From Swiss-Prot:
It comes from Escherichia coli (strain K12). GadX and GadW are part of a complex system required for acid resistance via the regulation of gadA and gadBC. Many of the described circuits use mutants missing one of the network components. In the wild-type situation, however, many of the scenarios are not easily observed. Gene3D superfamilies: Homeodomain-like (1.10.10.60). PANTHER family: HTH-TYPE TRANSCRIPTIONAL REGULATOR GADX. This is HTH-type transcriptional regulator GadW. Pfam families: HTH_18 (PF12833). Residues 139-236 form the HTH araC/xylS-type domain. Signal peptide: none annotated. Transmembrane segments: none annotated. Homodimer. GO terms for biological process: DNA damage response; DNA-templated transcription; regulation of DNA-templated transcription. Keywords: Activator, DNA-binding, Repressor, Transcription, Transcription regulation.
Length: 242
């Protein structure tokens, strides 16, 4: 999968120019840049080390964020974030691990990439930068819904958060051969599946967490989507169901 952003480790202090401003980069600082910006700078390899992060990893990071403030600042156009004092032993270990053949399983690699992103979690601009790196409108809609699956979502809520119109979102989703209702349903059913697979949670609680006020309606929707009831599904999953 093509990368959408990059983490750069600075190994020698130098200056760059971004949007007509000089930015001083200090030794042992790290940068997070969107793909095009990272490619444009063409950092000299002796002075930097670089990790490219793909869209799936970005989505995994955003998926674990719940109940964000209503104003996410998604209109922000920041394309570069700097952490001047990251935990260098951890940073070095992460970068070194990708140079060791046979060490990085997909699961471990994903954890290391997520650790890199988390080093910018204190920056309020992180979520907008990652969100805007997602290439499709359907992907962005899915991520917004994932921030609060239990919410009673309407298309106008998505349009408000994306600072655009409902009609434009509809058109772009049609161009991607999907629609808002399909994305909402898929997001809720994916959450239901994860809860049934991983935890022992009462059915009415699972329904509520997935945005359904009626447990019977949730059961019917789940059966139509997966072809089995939640109880039947849970019987074949590692967890138990009550």
């Amino acid at each position: 999968m093509t990368h959408v952003c990059s983490v750069i480790l600075i190994r020698r202090s130098f200056d760059i120019y971004h949007e007509q401003q000089k930015i001083s980069l200090h030794n042992e600082s790290i940068l997070l840049l969107e793909k095009n910006l990272a490619d444009d700078f063409a950092f000299c390899s002796p002075d930097t080390r670089r990790l490219d992060i793909d869209e799936l990893t970005v989505c995994h990071y955003l998926q674990n964020i719940r109940q964000l403030p209503r104003n996410l600042g998604l209109h922000s156009k920041d394309r570069l974030l700097i952490n001047q004092s990251p935990p260098m032993p951890l940073v070095t270990a992460i970068f070194d691990s990708f140079n060791e053949s046979g060490v990085n399983s997909p699961i471990l690699s994903n954890m290391l990439y997520l650790s890199c992103l988390s080093m910018f979690s204190h920056k309020k601009e992180l979520i907008p930068l990652l969100f805007n790196s997602i290439s499709t409108v359907s992907g962005k809609v899915e991520r917004l819904i994932s921030f609060d699956i239990a919410k009673r979502w309407y298309l106008r809520d998505i349009a408000e958060r994306m600072y655009t119109s409902e009609s434009l979102i509809k058109k772009k989703l049609q161009d991607e051969n999907t629609c808002f209702s399909k994305i909402l349903l898929a997001s809720r059913m994916s959450m239901a599946r994860r809860l049934l697979e991983l935890r022992q949670i009462p059915l009415h609680t699972i329904a509520e967490k997935c945005g359904y006020s009626s447990t019977s309606y949730f059961i019917n929707t789940f059966r139509q989507y997966y072809g089995v009831t939640p109880h039947q599904f849970a019987q074949h999953s590692p967890g138990t169901f009550s």
